[in-house]
């Protein structure tokens, strides 16, 4: 369960959404990589990064990737990124995954850019790495990357209308096509746990946790549900009490979802969830693209341990 902290949120000024959080072993700082929000029709075309030493005060660093300047295969709708820090031959390298609108008019596709620093500069690989749906419908968006601490293997997850996962090749720039797995959690409703988008995966105490968002990003009812599994590619067992983050109108909190999760380094079992919510002033006017980033501690009291 996530514990809403009204006073501390939002943590970033302005409109941002779909936050990915990273703790860098190289710099000993925290970073958030969000969708740039506030544009009608989710029309943001660039990604920024924010940094912090303490998870409380955040500094805007820079634009790290601009679809119109830095990416040849895309022209806009820069959405929902994720990042992985890898130590390769004694040097740190950063793999930044994102979705964007393809210049070939084939809809949303997923790309990857690389850097030697959490703040870039990032260089795009030059082509999308996920271009089509394994189920023939839905969107190739909302990418997540996860490295399994038990094997060292890295995995990519994505999907809107479906959830897919695949093992990444060692270069982190492509997936092993034969491992692509449709993982969509079965069942549920918009009020409970029906999968919509935004998969997120992490590992704790021998268990793989799978989080996803339910309903629509412009709805106050947009919320987070979860399940668990015994392998990075499922199958996913939906939890008995699957909802872990949902609106609280009395606290003026609406549509809290599309999250990432952080285990605080050097602390035994301290975790935070970073997510966006709808800015309360825009509930009736473009709620889906007036979102703000928040952070709350996670309690495992009611979650499978």
Language model features: what each stretch is:
Residues 163-164, 172, 187-190, 208-209, ...:
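Short, catalytically relevant binding-site loops at active-site mouths
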Residues 20-41, 62-64, 79-105, 124-126, ...:
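Hydrophobic core segments of beta-strands in well-ordered, beta-rich domains
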Residues 173, 180, 293-300:
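Acidic, small-residue rich beta-repeat scaffolds with periodic aromatic anchors
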Residues 301-305:
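Conserved small/polar residues in nucleotide/adenosyl-binding loops
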Residues 3-25, 39-42, 56-87, 103, ...:
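Surface loop/turn signatures of beta-propeller and other carbohydrate-active proteins
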Residues 43-46, 105-111, 162-167, 219-226, ...:
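Structural motif
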Residues 225-296:
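Aromatic sugar-binding interfaces of carbohydrate-active proteins
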């Amino acid at each position: 369960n996530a514990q809403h902290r009204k006073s501390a949120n939002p943590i970033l000024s302005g409109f941002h959404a779909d936050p990915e959080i990273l703790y860098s072993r190289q710099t000993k700082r925290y970073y958030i990589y969000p969708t740039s929000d506030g544009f009608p029709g989710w029309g943001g075309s660039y990604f920024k990064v924010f940094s912090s030493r303490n998870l409380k005060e955040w500094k805007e660093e820079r634009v790290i990737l601009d679809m119109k300047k830095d990416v040849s295969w895309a022209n806009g709708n820069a959405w929902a990124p994720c990042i992985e820090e890898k130590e390769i031959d004694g040097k740190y390298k950063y793999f930044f995954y994102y979705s964007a609108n393809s210049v070939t008019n084939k809809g949303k596709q997923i790309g990857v850019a690389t850097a030697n620093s959490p703040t870039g500069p990032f260089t795009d690989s030059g082509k999308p790495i996920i271009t089509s749906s394994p189920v023939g419908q839905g969107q190739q968006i909302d990418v997540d990357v996860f490295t399994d601490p038990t094997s060292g293997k890295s995995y990519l997850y994505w999907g809107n209308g479906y959830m897919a996962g695949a093992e990444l090749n060692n270069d982190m720039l492509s997936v092993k096509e034969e491992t692509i797995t449709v993982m969509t959690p079965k069942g549920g409703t918009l009020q409970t746990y029906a999968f919509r988008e935004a998969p997120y995966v992490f590992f704790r105490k021998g268990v793989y946790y799978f989080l996803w968002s339910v309903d629509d990003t412009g709805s106050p009812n947009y919320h987070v549900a979860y399940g668990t599994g015994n392998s990075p590619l499922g199958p996913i067992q939906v939890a008995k009490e699957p909802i872990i983050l949902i609106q609280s109108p009395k606290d003026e909190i609406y549509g809290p979802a599309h999250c990432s999760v952080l285990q605080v380094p050097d602390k035994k079992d301290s975790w935070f969830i970073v997510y966006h919510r709808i800015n309360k002033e825009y509930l009736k006017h473009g709620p889906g693209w007036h979102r703000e980033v928040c952070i709350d501690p996670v309690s495992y009291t009611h979650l499978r341990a």
